[in-house]
Curated annotation (Swiss-Prot):
Belongs to the type I cytokine receptor family. Type 2 subfamily. Gene3D superfamilies: Immunoglobulins. This is Leukemia inhibitory factor receptor. GO terms for molecular function: ciliary neurotrophic factor receptor binding; cytokine binding; cytokine receptor activity; growth factor binding; leukemia inhibitory factor receptor activity. Residues 1028-1063, 1082-1093 have a biased composition (Polar residues). The WSXWS motif appears to be necessary for proper protein folding and thereby efficient intracellular transport and cell-surface receptor binding. It comes from Rattus norvegicus (Rat). The gene is Lifr.
Amino acid sequence: MGAFSWWRQPSWMADNKRGRMTPSLPWLLSALTLLHLMMHVNGLKRGVQQDLKCTTNNMRVWDCSWPAPLGVSPGTVKDICIKDRPHSCHRLETTNVKIPALSPGDHEVTINYQNGFQSKFTLNEKDVSLVPDTPEILSLSADFSTSTLQLKWNDKGSALPYPSNATWEVKVLQNPRTEPVALVSLNTVLSGKDKGHHWNWTSELPLQCATHSVSIRWHIDYPRFSGYKEWSEWSPLKNISWTRNTETNVFPQDKVVLAGSNMTICCISTTKVLSGQIGNTFRPLIHLYGETVAINILNIPVSENSGSNVIFSTVDDVYGTVVFAGYPPDVPQKLSCETHDLKEIICSWNPGRITGLVGPRNTEYTLFESISGKSAVFHRFEELANETYWLTLKMAPDQEIHNFTLTARNPLGQTESAIVINATERVALHVPISLKVKDVNSTVVTLSWYLPGNFTKINLVCQIEICKANSKKEVRNVTMRGAEDSTYHVAVDKLNPYTIYTFRVRCSSETFWKWSKWSNEKRYLTTEATPSKGPDTWREWSSDGKNLIIYWKPLPINEANGKILSYNVSCSSSEETQSLSEILDPQHKAEIKVNKNDYIISVVARNSAGSSPPSKIASMEIPNDDITVEQAVGIGNRIFLSWQHNPNMTCDYVIKWCNSSWSEPCLLDWIKVPSNSTGTVIESDQFQPGVRYNFYLYGCTNQGYQLLRSTIGYIEELAPIVAPNFTVEDTSADSILVKWDDIPVEELRGFLRGYLFYFQKGERDTPKTRSLETSHSDIKLKNITDISQKTLRIADLQGKTSYHLVLRAYTHGGLGPEKSMFVVTKENSVGLIIAILIPVAVAVIVGVVTSILCYRKREWIKETFYPDIPNPENCKALQFQKSVCEGSNALKTLEMNPCTPNHVEVLESRSIPPKIEDTEITSPVSERPGESSETDPENQAAVSYCPPIIEEEITNPAADEAGGASQVVYIDVQSMYQPQAKAEDEQDTDPVMVAGYKPQMRLPINPTAEDTTAEDEADKTAGYRPQANVNTWNLVSPDSPRSTDSNSEVVSFGSPCSINSRQFLIPPKDEDSPKSNGGGWSFTNFFQNKPND
């Protein structure tokens, strides 16, 4: 401590002084060196050692090393001593030493140097590192076909004193890559002995494509060692490379890979590779070295049977390979083993999932039996879905237990399945062959068959199937002792004579596994036996009652026991016995002439084996006056009959039946029912729907048979096929009486339940009556349920009316066809009389009432319908002032417009009586077509309407004196009142005075003559003639009408009111007189007589 302090103080002082001044650099370096040496020497004296390291590779020896102290040569070490250890000092010349492993705990170690220096330190196992020796690779080989590296090395476990766990790391390098492509850890156990290890690694890159190097290191894990455990150094690299010895450029070749996996394929080429593809899919190129490239294929699908092509294209060539992708074999499923003959064992299985690999790459199956050591191989070049494979192995003598292992193997892997069986419990026999049948008697036969196999140690169970026509199959089990390749015999009894049987056989072991297949069928007819029963017999008396007819049924096959050849019939009474000659089959009827005595009839059937027991029946029939007749309806082809129990019946009941339409005696069939029965169901294929059958129930007593009940029935009711025939018995004005006949039983086809009668009004062949439907409201329907009724009166009808009548019968089976008729009811005379009298009485009453009313109202009727016509002279409306009418141009109503007359007539003689003419207004062209053609067209005018003209000749003395005749033309002006009829004594009155109102103008014949006397005279004789101013008329106007027959100028003028109407323009102002219709027509015109209209 003093030395250390001494060296420390100058150093501090020096630093302190350096803070105040700057010393020189050499002095500073010298001080530091001296300080370091002092501290190191002081530490050696105190036993403090730095950088001491100890390692071990086998936990037996520790290898310790340390650096030499400063100023001490490594060769000056004298010894090293370990305290508390025998022989603790070791002579040394270097700074490292190997010492035996120390016990756990701290140990003091002293190192002495020749120069007197000494170093001490504490050593513990925790400070020691366990570093194994560098491992050595024994061999590195390669399987280029599978791209697999095979590595071998030795763990040198004998160098370690204790068993330990070792961890190995293997790294694989691919040239030219420097980083490992694989780094794998492996665990082993060091047992204290040298042990070799091997490891296989498959490269994704084919080994041919690059140089591969392998190096390993290891780590020992000994739990009791408390020091550091470190990895060893990596072993030197071991290389593997491919020496090209083929022309192949693409690797791997014909590789089998797992479907869905990834793989790398490379191409070694001296020229540039352009592309790489699998199938039609191009993949990117991976450059390895030089021109060598590779492609990665991801998720490879299952390939076709021919594989998937991989192609590399270079500048001058194309290279390729084939890849087969599939699956490893599935575990064999449903593995089962059995034997057919205890000589060979057959194992079958289902391959499971299809691998997708075929040919030499398909799955190979190996069946190995571990007890006997026998094996068999199965190899199939194709795979089929749901196919069953099988292999056969020979059985060893006296070996029952067999342990089978089935291994499935293909290039992608292998699986296996195992099974243990007892062969005697897995016996599935072969199909029995050579089945034969041999007679023993009519009810027993012997069956024999051959069965291959060695069954001496087991019992067999065989099933015999017995089948006959129209019967259920019968199966019988037979147990027998097994034999070797033997024929087996079995007796089959309880058979029916003369019956065809079909036999077949199958067998199994007594410890049942499964049945064999059925043998071929064998048909066989048993021999005949005597009939077991006599025929079922019945008897009927003939219609005349003199002969007895015997009926019998053919015996069933199970009772005939053979082919019936003939029948023997005999009848016996207390007085005599009769036997008929032999009746050959198939006749089943015989007739015997007997009297009224009681006979017992006997019938015997005979076949080649003998005769049957006789069947007997009594001929006597006990009368019964109390017989009821009932109705019955069946279902399908059967009918049920019932009756009350009769204690007097001592033997069977007999029910016979026949078609109702057949004549007596009729017999279709019969059955016998035990005497304790009260009903039975009769079933027969001869029953037909819609046919009536008679059923007769006979009771049997010791004296004979008695008829107890008669039943009529149908198996099924149908609708009648004909309509009832009906006629009209009587007709009246309000009713019709119809009558119909019964329908024959054969055509009724069921029990008659009633009639439906339709009627309505209607004529024949009208659409309304062609078919009657009850849905129409005007159709009347009567349902007649009393089937005994055969007439019907229809009341409340109308007389002399046609009715449509329809009649239909019906059963439970439906409605029959309809029969229609048209009937007309008679006329009702009382109604006709009433129909005549009522209108006559009404007419008389109406006439009387009308006459009374007309008489009382006659004045009103006259005024309304036929009033008096007033005198025009008294009409003030027509009394015009002359001064007003003359010379006034403003009065256009009285102005005469020119009008073309339709007729002009010139009177040459004055002796002709006055003539009044009312003609139609026509065109002059139509009146005189001959003359109009010569007339100037300019003078022609068409008049659509002009009032008719009344011409009247008036004798004028003044005119006569002047030497000419004058003509006056009148225009008929229609009066508003009906003219009154004139008496015959008034016809001689002056024509001028009776001409009525005739407005006119009289023109002188000579216009130059102005004789006022003549005018005044004319006014007096002609009456009232309103006229225009004569002086203002232009008689020579071209528009004036002129006569074409003479040179005289005769002009006609229109009405003083209008030239286009016959009505007055100024109506009468008398309020009591009727008013004219403004439309030019009045009710009075209807009663007016106009000549020539």
